[in-house]
Design a protein with these regions (language model features):
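C-terminal partner/receptor-binding element of secreted or periplasmic proteins
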Residues: 73-96
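Mid-chain, structured segments of secreted extracytoplasmic proteins
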Residues: 46-80
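Surface-exposed, polar/charged interaction patches used for macromolecular assembly or partner binding
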Residues: 37, 50-52, 90-96
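Terminal, regulation- and interaction-focused segments at domain boundaries
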Residues: 1-36
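A generic structural signal for ordered alpha-helices
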Residues: 1-4, 43, 66
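Extracytoplasmic/secreted envelope proteins and their assembly/folding machinery
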Residues: 19, 23, 27, 62, ...
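A short, aromatic/hydrophobic, helix- or strand-capping loop or linear motif
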Residues: 33-45
Length: 96
């Protein structure tokens, strides 16, 4: 994950929701998003200093969510850029 962070996010999104609410929504959506007929699951953990990180199995797709102003900022990272990366992006976008 650190290598992906050093390369920069695939997409940066802002939300009026709190960081906790946004993180829980992304986790829920990823846990229920079917890829190849299965659901890969998603894990939510506290961020390094503040906020949260939500990641899929294998950590190929993850989002760092930090409080920003009265809402939150979500930085979406991909390890493998493919059509699944765009499908995974729909979850954080839908949670804004």
């Amino acid at each position: 994950m650190n290598e992906a962070r050093q390369s920069g996010p695939y997409k940066v999104l802002t939300s009026k929701k709190t960081d906790a609410a946004l993180a829980k929504c992304v986790q829920y959506e990823w846990q229920n998003q079917s890829i190849f007929g299965g659901t890969p699951g998603a894990t939510l953990q506290p961020g390094r200093d503040t906020g949260y990180t939500v990641f899929t199995e294998g950590s190929q797709y993850f989002v760092d969510i930090q409080p920003k102003g009265s809402g939150a900022e979500a930085k979406y990272y991909v390890v493998v850029g493919n059509w699944i990366a765009n499908k995974r992006l729909a979850a954080p976008q839908g949670c804004l």
